[in-house]
Amino acid sequence: MTKKKSNDKNNNEKIIANNRRAKFDYEIIETYEAGICLTGSEVKSLRTSSVKLDDAHAQFTKNNELEIVNLHISEYKNNAKISVHKENRPRKLLLHRREINKIISKISKDGLSAIPLKLYFNQKGLVKLLLGIGRGKRNVDKRDSIKDREWKINKQRTFKNFNH
């Protein structure tokens, strides 16, 4: 028997890393899917999920290109010492020109930040980065989001107990 193909895009994605802290620290307004320029040893290292997205952010260069900085990809352990990559080097993001222009205008004019949300392999096996454009939350906003989350949990508990 043959398996039916699913129309769901997320079935074949293998998530490498999630930036869970970003959704707590930033109010995400828009997201973009971007490719990323990597060397062979970096891709091998990503297959073992040895990456840190915590301090990473996107910035634009003098050539009006976007690059991700402070993305820490650890050294591949089984690699020859000749082709070792730098762990924290800036990596170019691959987007269409109109998307880059949109992001750059939002970063420079509106005072928003570009934060990586998720790093994953897509259906074709290519490394993709989900880039979020957002505004930083203040402590009051963080407390409000915690209160909302706790209220939803308590509401679900009461409805669950009420139905039984």
Describe these PLM feature segments:
Residues 1-34, 39, 147-164:
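Intrinsically disordered, Lys/Arg-rich N-terminal extensions and targeting peptides
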Residues 13-112:
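Ribosome large-subunit tunnel/peptidyl-transferase-proximal elements
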Residues 67, 77, 128, 138-140:
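Intrinsically disordered, low-complexity acidic/polar segments
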Residues 88, 95-98, 136-164:
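C-terminal end-helix/capping segment
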Residues 94-132, 136-138:
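Beta-rich strand-turn-strand
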